[in-house]
């Protein structure tokens, strides 16, 4: 054990020790190292670096920094670089101000960058240690800062550089060819001199460039506007924007693209939006009038670049669209054809839908504006709901020529677009019910499928409450068909005769159909009256407790008519007749399709040849308004439908006028439909007032029901809040006025459904 300890002890005594590196150097030696490095730096700046040993220079720089002489090395470097840039480089650049300035500056910049890379490599250890410890700029950046301050930003060099670049760009804008590479190099230099920032580039070039550009484009805009149409101006602005983007891409820093484009947009678009849009014979309205979708698309694309650009376009488009719409719906020309009226609106909508798709990129703002405009002018005319229903009526009737089912479907879809814009949907519903009833009862529907498809569209739009009555009408028609089959079987089984009358009865549910509460009187002739009484007894025997009321205004009849007189030509000679069934030399037979009122009038003439207006009124008991309309259809309609003659021969029906059968009546058709006067023109003024009164009565009930529903749920509400809630609930059908809502609230208070609170009379409570 003792030997081991000795051995261990002797190894410890002979262990090597490393002596600490001396931290101080002789000043003379330090100066000699610096002189060596200084000379090398100067040689590099003079581009005489071929004989230098970079390894030796690195080692000497390393030694200086290691021995805490980094500050001397850093300060010395700054002085040497500064001296070279001031005495040599700056002088060369100043001498070139009037000759090859950019090339000289660019060469000096490239040489300086190359030199600083070499110097940085030599002084790499100083960058890693001294620069990090003392938080100063690294070698390369120090070189950039000195070049920036002593050369590029030196008084007249800075000004001359800026002016040279601006002049070159101005010349290029005028069409001259310039050295783009020189501009690009100068801009890259300014960006690098910003040391990862844009300040140098921005202050020395970009800011004055944008200012100069604004002045240039301001003058150019005046020239462009004076010399060009709107579409050409737009194309020139587009070209100018593209040119500036292309210049940035090839010459300037990419960060300049956004500000220069904004300058162009401000000077060429924003400041002149109204002028461009309203240009006479070439602006937006001109483009819309002439369907210039491409020009509109160019304008949209350009104006979408600037704030409020699309708003300016929209406002101008809206003014034009409203003018067009108001002209279409104006009530000046009474007797306007409803089908043409709606078709005109649909054509206008199609035009603007095309602009929306092809020119305005289906833009939401334009879409909403167009919809708002259509809603505005469609509701200016109180007859719009009636006319829309008549338009649909026309498309769903049998005999619409040249339209496939798919085409009818497309038209109905377009009609539904107008329906959505309509505020008085309840008025439309009332008219639609009337027109549907007429189609169903006269068997004029093109098909049940088309009818049900239309009702389905209305249901999707407004809900099942809106269409429940319309669907009920179809159920009634189906049940009536079954009832008539049973009635005919009953007649066969009992041998009861209807006296030659082919009777079809439709039993209608009062709530579904547009029946009249006060049914117009009419003395039905004995034969059809007798036939109906047989049906009445049959029906009531099956359905005890029910009541049947004849709705004369909804009925129709086919009459066998025989005309005996000769047909005369204008020269007085008599002619035979083609088309009618001729039984004798001059006897002609036709089937006349007429209303119940017209049938009642015509069957009088089986008894006598002549009747005065008063006699017809007394015999038939038809209300005067209905009688006048029926007689106008029979005696004052088209010659091919004039089955009665009237004395005197005027278009008006008045007391004392005498009516006889027109024995000279002829038609190429065996089956002649006697049109009701003005049937396609919509209701007369008195009828419209009556319809409006019925609508107003219905609305009172709907408003009251909505008020009660809301108050039952909320119990207590302030007046304005209740009015707003009621309006919100009913707007899908109509827009109730606050005045009407207030009246209905007062009515409910009187009937003790609601009460005012004692502390605030504008607050209501629900009375359970």
From Swiss-Prot:
GO terms for biological process: anaphase-promoting complex-dependent catabolic process; cell migration; cell morphogenesis; cell projection organization; cellular response to amino acid stimulus; cellular response to oxidative stress; COPII vesicle coating; embryonic cleavage. Pathway: Protein modification; protein ubiquitination. Residues 677-698 are annotated as: Disordered. Residues 682-698 have a biased composition (Basic and acidic residues). Neddylated. Attachment of NEDD8 is required for the E3 ubiquitin-protein ligase activity of the BCR complex. Deneddylated via its interaction with the COP9 signalosome (CSN) complex. There is a cross-link at residue 712 (Glycyl lysine isopeptide (Lys-Gly) (interchain with G-Cter in NEDD8)). Disruption phenotype: Null deficient mice are not viable. Extraembryonic ectoderm shows a greatly increased number of cells in S phase. In the trophectoderm cells are blocked to entry into S phase. Embryonic stem (ES) cells form tightly packed cell clusters with prominent actin cables and aberrant adhesions. ES cells are retained in proliferation, yet retain their pluripotency. Residues 2-41 are annotated as: Interaction with KLHL18. Core component of multiple cullin-RING-based BCR (BTB-CUL3-RBX1) E3 ubiquitin-protein ligase complexes which mediate the ubiquitination and subsequent proteasomal degradation of target proteins. BCR complexes and ARIH1 collaborate in tandem to mediate ubiquitination of target proteins. As a scaffold protein may contribute to catalysis through positioning of the substrate and the ubiquitin-conjugating enzyme. This is Cullin-3. It comes from Mus musculus (Mouse). The gene is Cul3.
